[in-house]
């Protein structure tokens, strides 16, 4: 059952669905010095070079490990490039195939698609520069392939609904659940694997995991009359979280992502 049948979408929010065809090119990168980071920043700021299909880029710098169950190296930066419909033909050679500039070591590159009803941002999203207490949570998740359908159902019917409420209440900046569609490159030392990435801007002080946040958000109004902790317990049996980090936002040139929802323009509330 679609989430639309029991929850109307607040007019201050955009929820990007798979049929909106938002495509994300993600790169996990290790940089050697500040000059190399400056090169990444310059590329993210000048994202328009990738043409009309590109909706922007964002760049995050690693700050701390929240949870780790992998021996793979911890990369210094994550870069997300957003496209409508398909990745621009210029992007993959520059970002993946060609030799990278000095000091930039590519560890993994992949194509991501949105998880059903679980990619939520405000209509007026302009980044989190005005919320210095927030950090960017990046959760790397491995779902057993045979359970992907069940995972999407739980994300759509419970996690996505809770995320909408938390973004609407400004508890979270955005909540962006994405699924790996294709791995374009993986360095030999990258032994860790995942097939989902969840991004969320939040205040880490007092944060004790999404399960508790989502359960509290759904405590009053339960989807399908199911106890939220039961639904979230299902996730624990079908997925692992090899790594979960907190990061600083270096570049957030991604406000145009909301424009991929062409069929439902945002309404501004005063």
What are the language-model segments listed below?
Residues 1-224, 229-270:
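Short S/T/G/P-rich N-terminal loop/turn motif that feeds into the first structured element of a domain
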């Amino acid at each position: 059952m679609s989430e639309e049948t029991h929850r109307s979408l607040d007019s201050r929010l955009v929820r990007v669905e798979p049929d909106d065809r938002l495509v994300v090119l993600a790169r996990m990168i290790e940089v050697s010095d500040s000059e190399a980071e400056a090169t990444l920043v310059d590329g993210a700021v000048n994202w328009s070079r990738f043409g009309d299909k590109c909706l922007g880029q964002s760049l995050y710098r690693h700050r701390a490990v929240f949870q780790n169950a992998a021996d793979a190296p911890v990369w210094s930066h994550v870069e997300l490039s957003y496209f409508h419909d398909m990745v621009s033909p210029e992007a993959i050679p520059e970002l993946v195939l060609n030799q990278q500039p000095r000091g930039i070591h590519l560890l993994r590159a992949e194509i991501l698609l949105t998880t059903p009803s679980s990619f939520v941002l405000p209509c007026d999203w302009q980044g989190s520069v005005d919320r210095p207490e927030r950090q960017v949570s990046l959760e790397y998740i491995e779902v057993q392939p045979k359970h992907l359908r069940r995972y999407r159902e739980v994300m759509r019917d419970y996690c996505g609904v809770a995320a909408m409420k938390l973004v609407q209440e400004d508890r979270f900046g955005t909540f962006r659940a994405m699924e790996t569609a294709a791995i374009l490159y993986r360095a030999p030392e990258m032994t860790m694997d995942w097939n989902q990435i969840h991004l969320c801007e939040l205040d880490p002080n007092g944060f004790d995991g999404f399960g508790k946040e989502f359960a509290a958000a759904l405590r009053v109004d339960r989807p399908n009359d199911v106890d939220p902790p039961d639904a979230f317990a299902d996730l624990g049996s079908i997925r692992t979280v090899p790594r979960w980090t907190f990061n600083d936002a270096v570049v957030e040139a991604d406000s145009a992502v909301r424009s991929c929802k062409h069929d439902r323009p945002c309404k501004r509330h005063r």
